[in-house]
């Protein structure tokens, strides 16, 4: 069986004293240190979570701001495009109006030149008619008959399409 001797008993007593001493000196401070370390880690995790939430809120805020900025930019582009199209239509309308005005001016100028040419032509025809008639008649007709013949000729010449 087991023998109890004094050294075994002394070793058991020494072991118990060592356990009490280690509990007082090492175990409690070690547990306190581990507890503090655990609390510190939990605080860091909570702080990191809080910062992550703040970062998420900032990201959402920035995304909303970017969306608003894109919408405003799109609106500005649409307004500028519409203004450009309206300006182009106005320029085209002005060009059409100017073309019509220039055409009317040109037609009026052509008509004036035509009337002027007709008047000059009539004057030349009258002069030539008088000369031709004078030579044909050889001064045998009276000037009254000559004028009547010329008037008839001018009247007939005025009815000609020129």
Curated annotation (Swiss-Prot):
F(1)F(0) ATP synthase produces ATP from ADP in the presence of a proton or sodium gradient. F-type ATPases consist of two structural domains, F(1) containing the extramembraneous catalytic core and F(0) containing the membrane proton channel, linked together by a central stalk and a peripheral stalk. During catalysis, ATP synthesis in the catalytic domain of F(1) is coupled via a rotary mechanism of the central stalk subunits to proton translocation. This is ATP synthase subunit b. Pfam families: ATP-synt_B. The keyword Magnesium does not apply. Belongs to the ATPase B chain family. GO terms for molecular function: proton-transporting ATP synthase activity, rotational mechanism; proton-transporting ATPase activity, rotational mechanism. GO terms for cellular component: plasma membrane; proton-transporting ATP synthase complex. F-type ATPases have 2 components, F(1) - the catalytic core - and F(0) - the membrane proton channel. F(1) has five subunits: alpha(3), beta(3), gamma(1), delta(1), epsilon(1). F(0) has three main subunits: a(1), b(2) and c(10-14). The alpha and beta chains form an alternating ring which encloses part of the gamma chain. F(1) is attached to F(0) by a central stalk formed by the gamma and epsilon chains, while a peripheral stalk is formed by the delta and b chains. It is a single-pass membrane protein. It is found in: Cell membrane. Keywords: ATP synthesis, Cell membrane, CF(0), Hydrogen ion transport, Ion transport, Membrane, Transmembrane, Transmembrane helix, Transport. The chain crosses the membrane at residues 2-22. HAMAP family: ATP_synth_b_bprime.
């Amino acid at each position: 069986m087991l023998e109890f001797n004094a050294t075994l008993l002394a070793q058991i007593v020494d072991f118990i004293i060592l356990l009490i001493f280690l509990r007082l000196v090492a175990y409690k401070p070690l547990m306190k240190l581990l507890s503090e370390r655990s609390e510190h880690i939990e605080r860091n995790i909570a702080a990191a979570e809080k910062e992550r939430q703040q970062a998420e809120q900032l990201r959402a805020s920035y995304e909303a701001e970017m969306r608003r900025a894109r919408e405003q930019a799109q609106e500005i582009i649409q307004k500028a495009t519409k203004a450009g199209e309206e300006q182009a239509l106005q320029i085209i309308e002005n060009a059409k109006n100017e073309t019509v005005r220039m055409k009317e001016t040109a037609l009026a100028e052509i008509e004036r030149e035509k009337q002027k040419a007709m008047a000059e032509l009539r004057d030349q025809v009258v002069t030539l008619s008088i000369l031709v008639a004078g030579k044909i008649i050889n001064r045998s007709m009276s000037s009254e008959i000559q004028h009547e013949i010329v008037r008839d000729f001018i009247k007939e010449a005025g009815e000609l399409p020129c």
